[in-house]
Amino acid sequence: MADKVIALACAAGMSTSLLVSKMQKAAADNGKDYEIFAKSTADIDNMLAGTGSPKPDVLLLGPQVAFMKGEVAKKAEIAGVPMDVIKMQDYGMMRGDKVLAAAENLMN
């Protein structure tokens, strides 16, 4: 079982799945055992409840769904899961290492 679970939520998932791959590589390169996955924003309630996938230790929203931050932040707080929006620059440049570092900062 992974040490930490990092969930990303986005609108559709294609570009976010590429970012997940880059985050997984950055974690592996640093000897970290993280489960990192992406799902649609429609799955946020299930993710926060740990239904259908492990409950995340942190939830990151893709910048294209940043407008949902207020609504999701309330749900995440109730679930005890820190969350934030991925920086547009890091998302656009697919900087998996930077997004991973942001997730780690939220978990600490």
From Swiss-Prot:
Q: Which cysteines are joined by disulfide bonds?
A: none
Deleted gene: phenotype: Disruption of the gene abolishes growth on lactose and severely impairs growth on cellobiose.
Entry EC number(s): 2.7.1.205
Q: Which residues form the PTS EIIB type-3 domain?
A: 3-108
- What InterPro entries does this protein's entry cite? PTS_EIIB-like_sf (IPR036095), PTS_EIIB_2/3 (IPR003501), PTS_EIIB_3 (IPR013012), PTS_sugar-specific_EIIB (IPR051819)
Keywords (A to Z) from UniProt: Kinase, Phosphoprotein, Phosphotransferase system, Sugar transport, Transferase, Transport
Q: Name one GO biological process term.
A: phosphoenolpyruvate-dependent sugar phosphotransferase system
Is Phosphoprotein there in the keyword field? yes
Protein induction? Induced by growth on cellobiose. Negativelly controlled by the CcpA regulator. Also induced in response to galactose.
Q: Which reaction(s) does its UniProt entry say it catalyses?
A: D-cellobiose(out) + N(pros)-phospho-L-histidyl-[protein] = 6-phospho-beta-D-glucosyl-(1->4)-D-glucose(in) + L-histidyl-[protein]
Q: Which domain of life is it from?
A: Bacteria
Molecular function terms from GO: kinase activity; protein-N(PI)-phosphohistidine-sugar phosphotransferase activity
Keyword Transferase among record annotations? yes
Could you tell me which residues carry Phosphocysteine?
Answer: C10
Catalytic residue list: C10
Q: What does this protein do?
A: The phosphoenolpyruvate-dependent sugar phosphotransferase system (sugar PTS), a major carbohydrate active transport system, catalyzes the phosphorylation of incoming sugar substrates concomitantly with their translocation across the cell membrane. Involved in cellobiose transport with PtcA and CelB. This system can also transport lactose.
Domain notes per entry: The PTS EIIB type-3 domain is phosphorylated by phospho-EIIA on a cysteinyl residue. Then, it transfers the phosphoryl group to the sugar substrate concomitantly with the sugar uptake processed by the PTS EIIC type-3 domain.
- The entry's protein name is PTS system cellobiose-specific EIIB component
Organism equals Lactococcus lactis subsp. lactis (strain IL1403)
